[in-house]
């Protein structure tokens, strides 16, 4: 999107800005790992969420530093009649971080074993395979609505703030949290594999249930 600033004095800054955001977010992701600690309930997912929250907070600060150091807070140019300011681009980055947080919350709601969607599928399974498939399909279709609305809202909001370049900055900020997000995504398959190995090895039933309790 920086090509919109071709031939202007801020072209280099516009190209460096997304790279600066990524660099800052790499550092914030590393810093966030130091906050991954078990609480009194021994919930590993809770510990991972602590790291994600810390990373998000640090990323806001990193985004502010990257914005100030590369493009500043004032007007940096005009694209298609739209005035682009560093402040607006900073808010675009914040929108990207908020969208990421909302998607994590929505995902937790639709996949958590103690939440309504999963419990409704389990309840439907009592009456047979058919109702299980029907309810599972219904929940899966329902679960795509909120993420789509959040993403569309983020696109519209960032475009109003900073045009296509602003949308690109929001996406860059989202990708900056990829380190902690991948850690969250990877934990599920690891615990599933641990439980499967325990079951195939004929270990005590409590050993099989333990990975599930970690979630």
Swiss-Prot record:
Catalytic activity: diphosphate + H2O + H(+)(in) = 2 phosphate + 2 H(+)(out)
Cofactor: Mg(2+)
MF annotations from Gene Ontology: diphosphate hydrolysis-driven proton transmembrane transporter activity; inorganic diphosphate phosphatase activity
Keywords: Cell inner membrane, Cell membrane, Hydrogen ion transport, Ion transport, Magnesium, Membrane, Translocase, Transmembrane, Transmembrane helix, Transport
Membrane topology, as annotated: Multi-pass membrane protein
Signal peptide: none
GO CC terms in record: plasma membrane
InterPro entries according to UniProt: PPase-energised_H-pump
Record-annotated membrane-spanning stretches: 16-36, 51-71, 86-106, 136-156, 164-184
Location in or out of the cell: Cell inner membrane
EC number(s) reported in the record: 7.1.3.1
Chief localisation class: membrane
Pfam entry (one): H_PPase
Subunit organization: Homodimer.
PANTHER family, A to Z: K(+)-INSENSITIVE PYROPHOSPHATE-ENERGIZED PROTON PUMP
Family: Belongs to the H(+)-translocating pyrophosphatase (TC 3.A.10) family.
Function in brief: Proton pump that utilizes the energy of pyrophosphate hydrolysis as the driving force for proton movement across the membrane. Generates a proton motive force.
Protein name, UniProt field: Pyrophosphate-energized proton pump 2
Organism of this sequence: Rhizobium leguminosarum bv. trifolii
Chain's gene name: hppA2
């Amino acid at each position: 999107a920086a090509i919109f600033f071709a031939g202007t004095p801020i072209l280099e800054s516009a190209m460096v800005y997304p790279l600066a955001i990524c660099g800052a977010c790499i550092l914030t992701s590393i810093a966030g790992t130091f906050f991954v600690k078990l609480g009194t309930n021994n919930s590993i997912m809770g510990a991972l969420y602590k790291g994600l929250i810390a990373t998000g907070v640090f990323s806001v600060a990193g985004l502010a530093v990257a914005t100030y150091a590369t493009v500043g807070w004032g007007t940096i140019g005009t694209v298609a009649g739209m005035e682009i300011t560093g402040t607006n681009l900073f808010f675009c980055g914040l929108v990207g971080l908020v969208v990421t947080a909302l998607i994590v919350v929505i995902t937790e709601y639709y996949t958590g074993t103690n939440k309504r969607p999963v419990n409704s599928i389990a309840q439907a399974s009592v009456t047979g395979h058919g109702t299980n498939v029907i309810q599972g399909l219904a929940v899966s279709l329902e679960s795509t609505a909120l993420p789509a609305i959040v993403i569309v809202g983020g696109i519209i909001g960032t475009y109003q703030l900073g045009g296509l370049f602003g949308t690109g900055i929001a996406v860059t900020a989202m990708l900056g949290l990829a380190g902690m997000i991948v850690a969250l995504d990877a934990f599920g398959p690891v615990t599933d594999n641990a439980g499967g190995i325990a079951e195939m090895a004929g270990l005590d039933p409590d050993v099989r249930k333990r990975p599930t309790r970690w979630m």
